[in-house]
Each structure stands twice: as structure tokens, then as C-alpha cells.
Amino acid sequence: MSIRNIGIMAHIDAGKTTTTERIIYYTGKSHKMGDVDSGNTITDWMPQEQERGITISSAAITCHWKDCQINIIDTPGHVDFTAEVERSLRVLDGGIVIFSAVDGIQAQTETVWKQAEKYEIPRLAYVNKMDRIGADFFKVVGDIENKFKTIPLVLQIPIGNESNFEGVVDIILNKELHFSMENGIPKLTYSQIREEFIEKVILFKKKLIDILSQFSEEITQLFLEDKEIGLDIIKREIRRGTISRFIIPVLMGTSLKNIGIEPLIDSIVDYLPSPFEKSFSAFSLDTNKKILVDPNENKKLSALVFKVQYSSVIASHLYFVRVYSGEINPNKKIINASNGKREKFTKIFRVFSNKNEQIDFVKTGDIGAVLGLKFSVTGDTLVEENNNVLLEAVMFPEPVVLMSVEPERSSDEVRLKEIFEIISKEDPTFSYSESKETGQLIISGMGELHLEIILTRIKDEFNLNVYTGKPQVSYRESAGKIVKEVFEFNNIFAGKNIDFKIGMIIKPLSRGAGNKIDFECGIEPVIKSAILRGITSAFVSGIFGYPIIDINVSIFSIVCGANKISESAFESISGFAFHSIFQKSDPIRLEPIMLLEIRTPIEHTGEIISTLNVMGGVIHSVSNIGEYDLIKSEAAFEKLFGYASILRSSTKGRGSFTMEFSYFKEKLS
């Protein structure tokens, strides 16, 4: 049976979850259609999701259509949960990007599009909500072409528009498609194209052939010879163009009213790739080089842990894995190639949202979940012996907001830390630490909503009440200038007199460059590893108490005294040395700058812009969408706490906004 691993991506409220629920229902996996407003969707299973009507975690669903197994991951649309999108895209072979026919391309649409480009994921575009006032299919198609510099391939034209939208004309089949429900059973009927649509169908069929002929010699030849271009050839070439990311097939519908679902599922099977149609990149631990691995040829296990989820039912973590080659089964001896530790699967599951079906194995190209791993985290590679490869890990953005938390009862502090450990293991964008000055527990995340959801989980899922401080900005710090110095340590450490000198050069790097450590002197591998650990640990907190970013540390000399120095001593003293030298680099504090996209009624645009200017914001653009203006701007995150209330008041509740992290900038005051 063929497999499709697909993700459904979009801006919040574009209809991702509703579309996913319809696909699940139409493929027979569910016997009822979930509804977001009613809070009974299958993919949004967390209580917080059902309560808020948004997707927070990436739910995995397996269903079947026309002898094809489809693994669907419904991803969040809110920017606070970008990590869920990122780790989902890492393991997908194809995607559906959903656009609102009214709002078109929105802020998070651009974000997920860029993420999909990063992972080179072939996509379909689905223009949803065609029945809404202001729906404009062809404007959205034009925006996709102009904004994303891609070639949209229109496969359908609408029958009616807005409240009169009733179906589509399939350009490839030359048929009208009408959608209905009879006793809860979907019914798709075909009819001849009405006279009023024939001219437009001919025009778009010609456009379709013109686009395909840009990369298909076969279609070009048939066209030049004035021969009929068969349905099989057209579908095959659309598939080839989609997989190569030369084109983006575009479909439409209104998922809430069950219009357009069957053609969308057909297109998943017809145009998106199978896991066996693409080699995957890996790092060879034998040659220290990047390699391409063909899953058709390599039968040894290589799998990626892309998500860790705590189950309160079994009081254990469930590990979601994508198998790139070979097979997972309980008898297989495996190694975590990321840390060299041996692991074992005790149980294997097929996942259906928050329900699990135990199975015997997960084969090449498939997605499943396992129990029994002890030393693995998100992004780790699992292999069998003698398969020395490392898969590309999932990269996550830095947290930008922090908050102090303490339990109602001081006796619960240990338990609270244990809960934080559980959550941080499953959510790489959440972290916690203990303030050196106050002893308070500090949690960090991607935004106010992100932390709010976590605090709700602590109360509802773990039955623990906590007090919280106000949300604060999670700043960063970096070096203000180059500094070169030798740090001397001549003291007692762990009961031994130690004489140790280490010379470092600390240089500031450009924003976004990350931290780098290099050695200009010869050194034993064991000592080198200890020093690396010590300095890396020191990056966690600088002189202002914030993480240190964007610096280069060069070790140019190491001198040891007569007494033998332990690894732990090298590690600890290297951290002391770094902090001592870093203090002399005139450290600077950095604040997060956020990108904002504000949607406001036209009559309130002036007031919104004035408010942004007072906040020190920078306006990038103002564009019009019917009765609304779209304002794109940037502002310091510390100025944006409570902005939702300000906007709601200014626009009488009709305005909305999204924001996402852009970059760190030196804070001058």
C-alpha cells in the first residue's frame, strides 16, 4: 500500500481543523464530523484546544483512500506554537496550504510557506471559505503567484460565488462537480459543463497545458503535433511538476459545507509524493560528510524522533517517530545515534489523534509512536547497529517571554519541577530555570498564550495550583567588543590544589550567527570535550542573567600545573574563565523585535498607526482588503504586552493582529 505523509498548514481560522475533520470523515476513519465551534473535533483533542477552538499540538491521524494510506498532521496556526509546525514539517513528504478565500495570504501563511520551502516540501493550495462574503478565488491565486514567486496551477473554477457557491468545474475532467449529503453519506455527482462556463474552461485548460509544457517535453510534443493529451499524461505531469516544486496545484471549496473535499483527497493521492520517491539527506558518521540515502536501497533502520508527548493515562512519554529506512519492531536492537546510547522499543502504536492502536512494526516511510525510550528527545536519530548515519535535527526558535511561577504550597516545589521536566521534554520551546538571586522558578516560552496554555495544563492535567508573576521579556546578551585574556586559576577544587591557565578571545558576531567555539591550540579530546561543555553551559546566563548569543570563543592557550586535573574540574573552571573574560567585553543587552500584522476597519487605521508610532514601532506597509486595512509593522516586544486590549478598544472589537519574533536588537535604555 502506498503512503502519503502530509501536513495541513495555514493561518489561524483559515479552516485547517475543519478541513482535516472532513477528510477523516470522508475517508471513513470517523463516523461523525467534528465541529470546531462545538468543541468535538477529533484532531483538537486537548481540553484547551476544544475550549479555545484553536489547534495547539500537531495531531497525527492515519486514514485510507483508494488503496493509499494517508498520515495527516494538523498543525497549529497560532504563531505561539510555531515549534509544532516546524517539527511536523521536518517529517512530511507533502503539504496542503489552506488559504481563506476572503483574507488570502496572512502573516502565519507566509511563515508556514517559508518553513515548507526550507524543508523543500511539495504542496497543494486549497482556497477555503468560498461561500463567504468577499470570497475571491482568482485574487488569491494571483496573490500566491506574486507573493511567493511560484506558479499556481488552477485545476478548478468556481460555480457561483459567495453565498451562491455550489460546486466546481474540474478543468482536467471537463465536468461540473456537485457535492451533497444524503443521510450523512457524502455524494459527489458529475454533470456536463454549462454553456456559461465553457469559454472560461477552455481558457484555463490552455493555461494549464502551457504551464505543463514548460517542463514536459511529452506534452509539448503532443501539443505541437495537435494530438490529444490524455488524462493519464496530464495527471502524471502535474504530479511530476508538483513533486519537483515547479508548480502548486490550486483547488477550492468550503469545508464547513462539505464542498470540494473529495477532489482534495484525490489530489493528495494523485499529486503528492510517496516516501519512496525522494532520497533523504543524512550525515555519515563514517566519512563525516553529508550523504543522500535512497530508502529503496537502504534496508537498515534510520528513524527520527520528531515529537515527545506525555500521556497521563500511562504516566509515561510517547515518542513519535518517522521511519526513513528499514523497520521498527520490538525485537530490534537500536542505538540513539545522537548520543550513542542503546535504546529499546517496548510497544509500538498507530496513532489516531489521542487514541493509540498497538501494532507489531512501523515500516519504511511510515509514522508511528513508541514506548520504552529512555535517553531520547525531539530531534534524535534512532538507528540499528552498523548504520552510522545522523538525520538532520529539528531546529526551534528561541523563547521571548518569561514568567515567575511558584506553587501554592512550598512542599509542592519538587513536584512542580518534575512537571516542568515533563513539559520541557515534549515542548522544546518551553524551558525553566531557577533565579540565582531570588530562588524563584522562571518559565520561558514563545508568547503569552503559550505560557497560559502550559499553566492551564499544570492546573487541569497535573492538579497543581500555582501563583504567577507578570509576563516579562526574555532578553539576550552578547559581547560589545573583542576581548583577549588569559584566565588563571590557582586554588583548591574538589579537595585538590589546581593550577590551570586558559586563554580566550571573545568576539561579537552578527545577529543570528549563533555561538561558536574553536580551538587554536592542540588539546586532548577528553579535555576538549570538558571545556566545550563548560563554556556551553556558561552561555545559559550572562552578567545580566540572560542567555548569551552571537559570540565566537577562541581558545588560544591551555597550561596545566603538575597535579592531574579531572574532567569535572576542566568543565567548571572553563565556565568560570569564560564568565570572567566575558564581563570585560562590555556586554550589551538585546531585546526581541516582533513583526506585527494588524487587520483593522479602514476608519481606525490612522489611530492604529499613531499608537504604533508612540510605541516606537516601525510601519512597513499598509494595504487594503475591502473594508479593512492590513498594517505590517515591527515593534519591541516589551511594548506589546496588553496590545490585544488596546487594539480591541481602538477598533470596537473589530480589529485583530498576529505577531511573531523577527530578530534581537541592542536595547539602548
UniProtKB/Swiss-Prot annotation:
Principal subcellular localization: cytoplasm
Any one of the GO BP annotations: ribosome disassembly
Ranges for domain tr-type G: 1-276
Single annotated GO MF: translation elongation factor activity
KW Membrane (keyword) present: no
Entries under InterPro entries matching the protein: EF-G-like_DII, EFG_II, EFG_III, EFG_III/V, EFG_V, EFG_V-like, G_TR_CS, P-loop_NTPase
Alphabetical list of Pfam families matching this protein: EF-G_D2, EFG_C, EFG_III, EFG_IV, GTP_EFTU
Signal peptide interval: none
Keywords, ordered alphabetically: Cytoplasm, Elongation factor, GTP-binding, Nucleotide-binding, Protein biosynthesis
Keyword Protein biosynthesis: yes
Subcellular localization: Cytoplasm
Amino acids binding GTP: 10-17, 74-78, 128-131
Entry's transmembrane regions: none
One Gene Ontology term, aspect cellular component: cytoplasm
Family stated for the protein in its record: Belongs to the TRAFAC class translation factor GTPase superfamily. Classic translation factor GTPase family. EF-G/EF-2 subfamily.
Function: Catalyzes the GTP-dependent ribosomal translocation step during translation elongation. During this step, the ribosome changes from the pre-translocational (PRE) to the post-translocational (POST) state as the newly formed A-site-bound peptidyl-tRNA and P-site-bound deacylated tRNA move to the P and E sites, respectively. Catalyzes the coordinated movement of the two tRNA molecules, the mRNA and conformational changes in the ribosome.
Name of protein: Elongation factor G 2
Source organism of the structure: Borreliella burgdorferi (strain ATCC 35210 / DSM 4680 / CIP 102532 / B31)
